[in-house]
Every structure is written in structure tokens, then in C-alpha cells.
């Protein structure tokens, strides 16, 4: 008996020292995490308190947003860091980096009629370009798509197949004065050229309706366009927040992430406060348990400007360190008001774009979560248009959830998920209306429980999960022009 008490005393003394990278206080006495137990720790009131905090952070600043490098995002980063650090369960760090911020506005008129346009971020500025409009063929991704008389004219290009940046570059190579990209699905179009490039020309976005109307007008006669683009640029310091459980096998890391920044236009409570708070809620709930595999949470910066934070992080890891990450889970927009329960198509069965080995199994796990409760779900395009992109480019298995952005809900989807047909999943996407009032409480609660379900499964065991592919480079650029949603900003950021 004496020896048992001595052993216990030694164990408690060791735990109380709180050695960094070792198990936190009380670890041996915590129950092993299970899917049911972790899900039961998820409370809607905690989720809503989190999104309301992000709203208050945005409201505290005149810009009313949480765009990277701005005061709203700086406060977001500090709050997340302090909340997770205070648990004592994680080793937490802020990963500093500098990225180029851009803000752009555009006006476009055709034959004297004003159109509702948005400028692509990182677009070169333009002061009252007046030129004839011509149409590019085949989505404008190749030099042969541009008419011989493109020089000095503004070119109209349909979205799809290649990135906005590539379209702008091809237009520049054809010596166009500017480019207008119109959507290939209903709704307006906002995005980014992905960075500065001397090949780019001033570039704006239009809705599918306005773009098709212009194409029809050109077919029947001359269309003169006036285009203005105002662009601002600034190098900004910003941070990822990375938190890893002190306990668990650090050579078998389960990683999940969500971007913590918003667009300039608003507070970004669904995009992506919902994902940020979803994983934070799970991170806090996980502190009640011990686990076998370490879990690493990430809150990414600057997703809205081209997946910059997650790409910076992945590029900071050599192959040996990245190989410790056995899978990556991404959660971006999980509380859309007119939601659909969507799972990244890791096996490629719906969109013919497969992820690295293990991505299919992640998809099947989320399918099981919904199926076991009799809840409908559907695949969403696994195209690399969110923060998982940098991971799958290095051959890390990935998956995740998404409840929809600007794509319009169909009558068939209404039968599955309820809501309103003919209305976007999130009509306030990338707008000032993306506030707490924009959150569907049922969707965010359900999807946060799904996050908990997946974390508990993989933190407990990777038994049956495919052997981690060798870390390397992998092409994930899709070649689909009509592919519906695949995430938030990434759906319109690049393509």
C-alpha cells in the first residue's frame, strides 16, 4: 500500500510540474475520448457565445470587419490564442508572417448603362478605360481563346477552368486594356487575382446574368464599355494560431483548421466565424479527455486573399515534420442560413477529383455521422479551393464540411435540407450582412458535433486508416468549368 501511494505521489508531482510538450495536469485520470462523450460536451450556447464574441470584436472597430492585418483580425487572433492557452491543455503559438493586402473597387458601364461590378483584389488600377468589348472563347485560359483584334479592347471572359489570375494574364498577353470575368452560376462574382503580376490587366467581376446579357449584345452589335478600378496595396503583419495537445502521440498528429479572417465587406460570422468557433468549441470540449493521438488545431490567417496563412504554414514544414500530420480536416462556413449538409468529395465519385489516399475514408466517416442519424447529405467539390489545398498538394489526406456560399439552392435540395429554392445558401456571403443574425443555429450545432465526432474517432485510433502517403508534391488544379461550390472564399477566390 505504501509503495502504491508513493507511486501516485510521484505521478501527481510530475503532472503538476506542467512540462511543456508533456501531458497536462490530471491527464492520467481523464477518461479516454469517445465520439459520444465528446459530442455530448458540445453545447449550442457555447457556440453562439463564440460567434457573438467575434461579432463584438468586429463591431468595436470602425471598419466593422476582421480582415487580416486589420485591428478586428488582430483582436480575433489574440482572443483565440488566449482562450486556448488558458485551458492549459495545449501548446499554443502564434505564427507571424507578412502578406500583401489589397482592396479594390470597380465601376463598369456598357453602352451607357451602369452594371453592378466588383474588382478582383490585386487588380491593377484603371482610370476610366473606354474601349470596345470583345468576347474570349472557351473560358479564356489559352492564347488561342482571344480574338485577333483584342489589343486595346476590354475582353469579356466566362468564369471556369482556370484561375482568375490566369485569365487576367492571358488577357494581358493579348494586349487587352482590361478584362471582365462573369460568373458561371447565378449570382454576383467577387474574387482575387491571387497576387501582383505584371501580366495582369485591370480586372472586374460581373454576375452571370449581366455577363450573358453583354455576350448577347456583342453578338448583335458593338458594345462600348467604361471601366474604373481603384486598387490599394499594403504589406501587413498577421498570424496563424496553432495549438497542439500536450498529450498524445506527436508522431501521429490529427490536424484540423478553419480560417479566422473575414473579407473587407463585413464581420464574416458565417465565413468563417462559424468554422473558427466550431473548432474552438471542440478544442475546449476535448480538454475533458485523454487521447492516443495528438490533435493540432489551426486558425488560419488571410484565407480570403488566397489561402495565404495555411500555405505559409505548410511551406514552413519539411517533409519529415509534415509526415507526422496523418490527416487534415477543414471547416469553412458551417452555419449557412439556407444550408445544405455537404462533405468534401474525397473519393472523387461525384466530381472525379480525388484526394490523397485516406481522403475517401474521411468522407466516409462524415457520411456515417449523418447516416447514423438519418440526416441527408451531399458531396461538394474537392478542388483545393480552401485551406486544405496546401495539404493535399503535399499529399496529406484531407476532408471536411461545408454548408454553402453563393450558389443557389435547388428545389431538389429543398426536399433534402429544407430552406428556400432559388436563394443562395448564404445570401450574405462576402457581404456586410454576414452577422450573427446570418447564422443557422441548427446547421452550426450539427456540424460542430460532426467535428467532434471526427476528432474523437481519429484522436482515439487510426486503425483501418490507410497508411499515410509519402509527403511530396501533387497537382490539385481542377479542370472543371461548371463545378458548384467547394468552400467559401476559395470558391470565388481563384476560379
From Swiss-Prot:
Its main location: secreted. Its EC number is 3.4.11.-. This is Probable leucine aminopeptidase 2. Residues 1-21 form the signal peptide. The active site is at 303 (proton acceptor). Glycans are attached at residues 142, 235, 272, 352. The lineage of its organism: Eukaryota, Fungi, Dikarya, Ascomycota, Pezizomycotina. The record marks 429 as: Transition state stabilizer. Disulfide bonds: none annotated. InterPro entries: M28_fam, M28_SGAP-like, PA_dom_sf, PA_domain, Peptidase_M28. Residues 130-216 form the PA domain. Belongs to the peptidase M28 family. M28A subfamily. Monomer. Its cofactor is Zn(2+). GO terms for cellular component: extracellular region. It comes from the Eukaryota. Zn(2+) 1 binds at residues 259, 271, 332. Zn(2+) 2 binds at residues 271, 304, 430. Keywords: Aminopeptidase, Glycoprotein, Hydrolase, Metal-binding, Metalloprotease, Protease, Secreted, Signal, Virulence, Zinc. Extracellular aminopeptidase that releases a wide variety of amino acids from natural peptides and contributes to pathogenicity. Binds 2 Zn(2+) ions per subunit. PANTHER family: METALLOPEPTIDASE M28 FAMILY MEMBER, PEPTIDE HYDROLASE. It is found in: Secreted.
Amino acid at each position: 500500500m505504501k509503495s502504491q501511494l508513493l507511486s501516485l505521489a510521484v505521478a501527481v508531482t510530475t503532472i503538476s510540474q506542467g512540462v511543456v510538450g508533456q501531458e497536462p495536469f490530471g491527464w492520467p485520470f481523464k477518461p479516454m475520448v469517445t465520439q459520444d462523450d465528446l459530442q455530448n460536451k458540445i453545447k449550442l450556447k457555447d457556440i453562439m457565445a463564440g460567434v457573438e464574441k467575434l461579432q463584438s470584436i468586429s463591431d468595436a472597430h470602425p471598419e466593422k470587419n476582421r480582415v487580416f492585418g486589420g485591428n478586428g483580425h488582430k483582436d480575433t487572433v489574440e482572443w483565440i490564442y488566449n482562450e486556448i492557452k488558458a485551458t492549459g491543455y495545449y501548446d499554443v503559438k502564434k505564427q507571424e508572417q507578412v502578406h500583401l493586402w489589397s482592396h479594390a473597387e470597380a465601376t463598369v458601364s456598357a453602352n451607357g448603362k451602369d452594371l453592378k461590378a466588383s474588382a478582383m483584389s490585386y487588380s491593377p488600377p484603371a482610370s476610366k478605360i473606354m474601349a470596345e468589348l470583345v468576347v474570349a472563347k472557351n473560358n479564356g485560359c489559352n492564347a488561342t481563346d482571344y480574338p485577333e483584334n483584342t489589343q486595346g479592347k476590354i475582353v469579356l471572359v466566362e468564369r471556369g477552368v482556370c484561375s482568375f489570375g490566369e485569365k487576367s494574364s492571358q488577357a494581358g498577353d493579348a494586349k487587352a486594356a482590361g478584362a471582365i470575368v462573369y460568373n458561371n452560376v447565378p449570382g454576383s462574382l467577387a474574387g482575387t487575382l491571387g497576387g501582383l503580376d505584371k501580366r495582369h490587366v485591370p480586372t472586374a467581376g460581373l454576375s452571370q446574368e449581366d455577363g450573358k446579357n453583354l455576350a448577347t449584345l456583342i453578338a448583335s452589335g458593338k458594345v462600348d464599355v467604361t471601366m474604373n478600378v481603384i486598387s490599394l496595396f499594403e504589406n501587413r503583419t498577421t498570424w496563424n494560431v496553432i495549438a497542439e495537445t500536450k498529450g498524445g502521440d506527436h508522431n501521429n498528429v490529427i490536424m484540423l483548421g478553419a480560417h479566422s479572417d473575414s473579407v473587407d465587406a463585413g464581420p464574416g460570422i458565417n465565413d468563417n466565424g462559424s468554422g473558427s468557433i466550431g473548432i474552438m468549441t471542440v478544442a475546449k470540449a476535448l480538454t475533458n479527455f485523454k487521447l492516443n493521438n495528438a490533435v493540432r488545431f489551426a486558425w488560419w490567417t488571410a484565407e480570403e486573399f488566397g489561402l495565404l496563412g495555411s500555405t505559409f504554414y505548410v511551406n514552413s514544414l519539411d517533409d519529415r515534420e509534415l509526415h507526422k500530420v496523418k490527416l487534415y480536416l477543414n471547416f469553412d462556413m458551417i452555419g449557412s442560413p439556407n444550408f445544405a449538409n455537404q462533405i468534401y468529395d474525397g473519393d472523387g465519385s461525384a466530381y472525379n477529383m480525388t484526394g490523397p489516399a485516406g481522403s475517401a475514408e474521411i468522407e466516409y466517416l462524415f457520411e456515417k455521422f449523418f447516416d447514423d442519424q438519418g440526416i441527408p447529405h451531399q458531396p461538394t467539390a474537392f478542388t483545393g479551393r480552401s485551406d486544405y489545398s496546401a495539404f493535399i498538394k503535399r499529399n496529406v489526406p484531407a476532408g471536411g464540411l461545408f454548408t454553402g456560399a453563393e450558389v443557389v439552392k435547388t428545389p431538389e435540395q429543398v426536399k433534402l435540407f429544407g430552406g428556400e429554392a432559388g436563394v443562395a445558401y448564404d445570401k450574405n456571403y462576402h457581404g456586410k450582412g454576414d452577422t450573427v443574425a446570418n447564422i443557422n443555429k441548427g446547421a452550426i450545432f450539427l456540424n460542430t458535433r460532426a467535428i467532434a465526432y471526427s476528432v474523437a474517432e481519429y484522436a482515439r485510433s487510426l486503425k483501418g486508416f490507410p497508411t499515410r502517403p509519402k509527403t511530396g508534391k501533387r497537382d490539385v488544379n481542377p479542370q472543371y468549368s461548371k463545378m458548384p461550390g467547394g468552400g467559401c472564399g476559395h470558391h470565388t477566390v481563384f476560379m
